[in-house]
Amino acid sequence: MITILHYLRECSDMTADLIYTFQSLGLANGYDDVEAEFAPFKEFKSTWKRSGHSVRFQISDYLRGADRRVLEDFANSLYGCLTGEGPRGIYSDSLITWMGSKDFVNRNQPIYLKRSRNLTLDHHGQVYDLQDAYLSLREQGLVRACPDAVFNWTVRENRRRVGYCSVLMKVVAVSSILDSVDVPSYVSEYVLYHELLHIEDGMRPNRRHHDKNFRNRERLHPRWRESEEWLRRLASRPV
């Protein structure tokens, strides 16, 4: 009971900090009627509706736990977007640092997984184990240790989007279409490798994700050419 009350009090304090931060900075930016609330979006995003000197913000609840400085930097970035006078993008150095912290992942990864409907929440597949693929990549020296990352097969057999990840949440998804005796194990390993490269790169606001350097690293996988051919065949397979 005490733990629940403490959690509710903490949430209330965080919401109060959010409102105070956005309202005080709103006045400095010409908005005298400001509302701000946390919203349970699956991905990290925020929305706003503006009318004259009024503005309503819905802020990703993954920002719960951020300190006042991070909230202020984020609010300033959003107001900059509204006025068109701020820096490009919403990711300040303090925000990037905090979202790359272990505390951020520990707080938010379980929430993100709960909101992800197309994940089995298991690295064990019917045929292959993504944890084994990760260990194989480590033994080959292709990836660094990533102890916070979680690997999941998808529920649906995606043919074109065979892998994706949340760099923020350290979550990797590999399409279950690759979890088959008809598909060699190195194909899912290659897809996992691709996504782990993104996680290793971390947040890269306003930069290309698949640049020349990334493609060169991707091709360090010894079976990249065969894997790409497999992925092309699977993508063109009739539904």
Q: Model-derived features: where do they sit?
A:
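Active-site-proximal or metal-binding-adjacent scaffold patches in catalytic folds
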Residues: 1-189, 199-239
